[in-house]
Amino acid sequence: MLKALFICVASCLLVVNDGNIIHRCSLAKILYEEDLDGFEGYSLPDWLCLAFVESNFNISKVNENVDGSFDYGIFQINSRYWCNDYQSHSENFCHVDCQELLSPNLISTIHCAKKIVSGPGGMKNWVEWKLHCLGRPLSYWMTGCHLG
């Protein structure tokens, strides 16, 4: 009985977790307002492609890695280096709780992503961005988006 209740609650949480998808153009506008267009040489389409390949625009996505660390939020920021999840050792270079990276208010996420991109490797720190976005035409990510 307890096991069935746990499965039911876990399933409900997964459904809620999947419901925090931001529209591509809404994200573009927020990123533009936070001065990410051209930040460290990366365009808005780079950021949109990153958000898509990492989380499919899911602000509340959490993913466990084989090393026991977790990736959080729309950019899947890793707990081993960038945020504190209070579960495993973290360098916490962004000085932020990992749970803040799941907030619909993307300011903490954006500040942390800026810190990551400003360091060695830039967006190449995200393997999925390297595999699916780097060196590809990305302008279509802005199709239909009006920033003004």
Swiss-Prot record:
UniProt KW keywords: Antimicrobial, Bacteriolytic enzyme, Cell projection, Cilium, Disulfide bond, Fertilization, Flagellum, Glycoprotein, Glycosidase, Hydrolase, Secreted, Signal
Any GO CC annotation of this UniProt entry: sperm plasma membrane
Catalytic activity: Hydrolysis of (1->4)-beta-linkages between N-acetylmuramic acid and N-acetyl-D-glucosamine residues in a peptidoglycan and between N-acetyl-D-glucosamine residues in chitodextrins
Record flagged with keyword Membrane: no
Active site, renumbered: 54, 71
Disulfide linkage: 25-145, 49-133, 83-98, 94-112
Record's signal peptide: 1-19
Domain C-type lysozyme: 20-148
List of glycosylated residues: 58
CDD domains: LYZ_C
Gene3D superfamilies reported in the protein's UniProt record: 1.10.530.10
Compartment list: Secreted; Cell surface; Cell projection, Cilium, Flagellum
Enzyme class: hydrolase
GO molecular function: lysozyme activity
Free-text tissue specificity from the UniProt record: Expressed strongly in testis and epididymis and weakly in seminal vesicle, vas deferens, kidney and spleen. Highly expressed in primary spermatocytes and round spermatids (at protein level).
Keyword Metal-binding: no
EC numbers on record: 3.2.1.17
Top-level taxon in the UniProt lineage: Eukaryota
GO BP annotation list: defense response to bacterium; fertilization; fusion of sperm to egg plasma membrane involved in single fertilization; killing of cells of another organism
Assembly with partners or alone: Monomer.
Entry's family note: Belongs to the glycosyl hydrolase 22 family.
Biological role: May be involved sperm-egg plasma membrane adhesion and fusion during fertilization. Exhibits bacteriolytic activity in vitro against Micrococcus luteus and Staphylococcus aureus. Shows weak bacteriolytic activity against Gram-positive bacteria at physiological pH. Bacteriolytic activity is pH-dependent, with a maximum at around pH 5.6.
Official protein name in the record: Lysozyme-like protein 6
UniProt organism field: Mus musculus (Mouse)
